[in-house]
Every structure is written in C-alpha cells, then in structure tokens.
Design a protein with these regions (language model features):
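Catalytic cores of histone-lysine modification enzymes
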Residues: 2-99
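C-terminal SET catalytic tail plus cysteine-rich post-SET Zn-binding segment of SAM-dependent SET-domain
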Residues: 92-190
Length: 190
C-alpha cells in the first residue's frame, strides 16, 4: 500500500528493503525533506533495543529492524514511533540524500536533484567494527560496498577483504602442498 507522507514524499514497497521513501515529484538539491522524530534514549537503552532485534531476527529476519539514530555521545533517537515516516528511508552506497543535525533535530535533506518516482536514500554511516558483517548491503548501486558502512570506512573494508583473500590463498596453497606430499607415489623396484 502506498502512503503519502507530504507533498514530495511517498512510502511504498522498495526493491532495497521492505518499504522505502520515494519522490512524489521532482525534488531539487538541498531540500529538507522530513524530520527524523522519535523517543530520546540512552546509549544503554539503544544497545538493548538492538540486542532484542538481533535475537528476534534469529527466528524471523523481518523482525531484524531497529530505527536507532545517533543523536550525540550520550543519547540516540529511537525512531520506531508512530508518525515517524522518516524511518522508512533505506541505506544506499550511492545516496541522493543525507542526514543533517540542526539545533538538536535530525533532518533528511536531498544532496542532488531527485527525479519523480526515484527512491530517496542516505548512507546510514555505520562504523567498521566487529559487527559490520551483521549489516549486509542490498542497495544494488554500482559502487556498493557490500556492507552498510560509512564511505570513510570503505578503505578499511577493502584492506580487510584483501587480507582475508590473501590468508585464504595461503591456506589453500598449504593444503595443496600437503595433499601433493601425502599423495606422492614412489616407485618400488621388484
């Protein structure tokens, strides 16, 4: 079901993930699209919400959703509240919007011209930490990093991927050497 948010935004099924936000009309660059609203929570509460979503996702992947937005070093915004249509913006490695902190409020702002019917996305900016693999990216962009990461962390991901490939190649070489040594035939003279 499609649902109009305001004069320029529409929520509908997304090819990226579940629901997404789409342009109802052409939108110019640098336009405030919508405010991200929610309940102010402590970092501890935020972690508990995320843990609960992860544990629920073990049995049902559709339950693996949180709408936590970092506000500052002490607090986050839990956007899983009625009326927060901004929670439906999906991540993309090639976004056409960004988030903007302004006077203790979070806005989603276009960063280029957006065509009518185009899905509006922003880079969620997750950090490259121990759980980055829990956040695979499905944006489909040509420059997709494969994981939902801040663009600044893509070089770290590339280095880690290269190191993993090198280790795998070394392990494979060692396995092949061992197989060749163990499987060598010696000829015995009668």
């Amino acid at each position: 079901m499609n649902s109009a948010v305001n004069d320029c935004l529409l929520i509908k099924k997304s090819p990226i993930h579940n629901k997404g936000v789409f342009a109802r009309n052409n939108i110019a660059s640098n336009v405030k699209l919508i405010e991200y609203i929610g309940r102010k929570v402590t970092k501890k509460e935020s972690r508990e919400i995320e843990k609960k979503a992860i544990s629920l996702s073990i049995t049902d992947k559709s339950l693996a959703r949180t709408y936590i937005f970092k506000l500052d070093d002490d607090f986050d915004i839990d956007g899983d509240v009625e009326g927060n249509d901004a929670k439906y913006f999906n991540h993309s490695c090639n976004p056409n919007a960004k988030y903007l902190y302004e006077h203790n409020r979070i806005w989603i702002v276009s960063i280029r011209n957006v065509r009518k019917g185009e899905e509006i996305t922003f880079n969620y900016g997750f950090g490259f930490d121990e759980d980055f693999k829990d956040h695979p990216c499905k944006c489909g962009a040509k420059n997709c990093a494969g994981y939902i990461l801040d663009e600044e962390d893509w070089p770290k991901l590339n280095r880690a991927t290269q190191q993993r490939r090198q280790r795998q190649q070394q392990e494979l070489s060692l396995e092949n050497e061992g197989a060749n040594k163990g499987g060598q035939r010696t000829s015995a003279s009668p």
